Amino acid sequence: MSNMEKHLFNLKFAAKELNRNAKKCDKEEKAEKAKIKKAIQKGNTEVARIHAENAIRQKNQAINFLRMSARVDAVAARVQTAVTMGKVTKSMAGVVKSMDATLRSMNLEKISALMDKFEHQFETLDVQTQQMEDTMSSTTTLTTPQNQVDMLLQEMADEAGLDLNMELPQGQTGSVGASVASTEQDELSQRLARLRDQV
């Protein structure tokens, strides 16, 4: 196993660890919510408020861990592509060397700064890999197509028997279906234009 592969393993491990921390925070949030109910039942509003603050703090922490886990995971996928293509630059290798201790610390600020460095390295790599990504499915990009996210959210809401529009901020209701429809319309228009060009 090369050094770069070891670092790649560490990145993937860190993403899982961050994910585990998010789940731990979720569990803590649920425990705090149970304590809120008990305190309210006893008529102790002040204690309930403290547990509510704790629950919100745990929820926010879980979101932060999840967000960072996804970011580290995306960078790991980009490193994997770079390793596969043999496009690991010296500056990228330098950033990778400094990461092991940072990832072990589970300090979100330090990890975020490290991910910033990585993403900067990948901006230059992106230009080189664009042709390859055009021929492959772009599963390694850092961003996810919004319409796919919206469709999955709608699908999950339907499965759970929930109305997704209730969760959307005002003014955005119905945007899920509309964005999917407009994307499909764009794709159809492009296909039609290509067919006309061929004739």
Swiss-Prot record:
Segments of this protein annotated with the region Interaction with VPS4A, MITD1 and STAMBP: 180-196
Residues covered by region (Interaction with SPAST): 174-199
Stretches with biased composition (Polar residues): 170-183
InterPro entries named in the record: Snf7_fam (IPR005024)
Coiled coil: 15-47, 177-199
GO biological process: autophagosome maturation; autophagy; late endosome to lysosome transport; membrane fission; midbody abscission; mitotic metaphase chromosome alignment; multivesicular body assembly; multivesicular body sorting pathway
Keywords assigned by UniProt, alphabetized: Cell cycle, Cell division, Coiled coil, Cytoplasm, Endosome, Membrane, Protein transport, Transport
Entry annotated with the keyword Cell division: yes
Signal peptide: none
Membrane topology: Peripheral membrane protein
Cellular component GO terms, alphabetical: amphisome membrane; autophagosome membrane; cytosol; kinetochore; kinetochore microtubule; lysosomal membrane; midbody; multivesicular body membrane
Chain segments carrying region Interaction with VTA1: 180-199
Pfam families, A to Z: Snf7
Region (Interaction with IST1): 132-156
Motif position, MIT-interacting motif: 186-196
Ranges for region Disordered: 167-199
Residue ranges of the region described as Interaction with VPS4B: 183-199
Subcellular location: Cytoplasm, Cytosol; Endosome; Late endosome membrane
First-listed, main subcellular location of the protein, grouped into a coarse class: cytoplasm
PANTHER family reported for this sequence: CHARGED MULTIVESICULAR BODY PROTEIN
Subunit-structure text: Probable peripherally associated component of the endosomal sorting required for transport complex III (ESCRT-III). ESCRT-III components are thought to multimerize to form a flat lattice on the perimeter membrane of the endosome. Several assembly forms of ESCRT-III may exist that interact and act sequentially. Interacts with CHMP1A. Interacts with VTA1; the interaction probably involves the open conformation of CHMP1B. Interacts with CHMP2A. Interacts with VPS4A; the interaction is direct. Interacts with VPS4B; the interaction is direct.
Family: Belongs to the SNF7 family.
Function, as annotated: Probable peripherally associated component of the endosomal sorting required for transport complex III (ESCRT-III) which is involved in multivesicular bodies (MVBs) formation and sorting of endosomal cargo proteins into MVBs. MVBs contain intraluminal vesicles (ILVs) that are generated by invagination and scission from the limiting membrane of the endosome and mostly are delivered to lysosomes enabling degradation of membrane proteins, such as stimulated growth factor receptors, lysosomal enzymes and lipids.
Protein name as catalogued: Charged multivesicular body protein 1B2
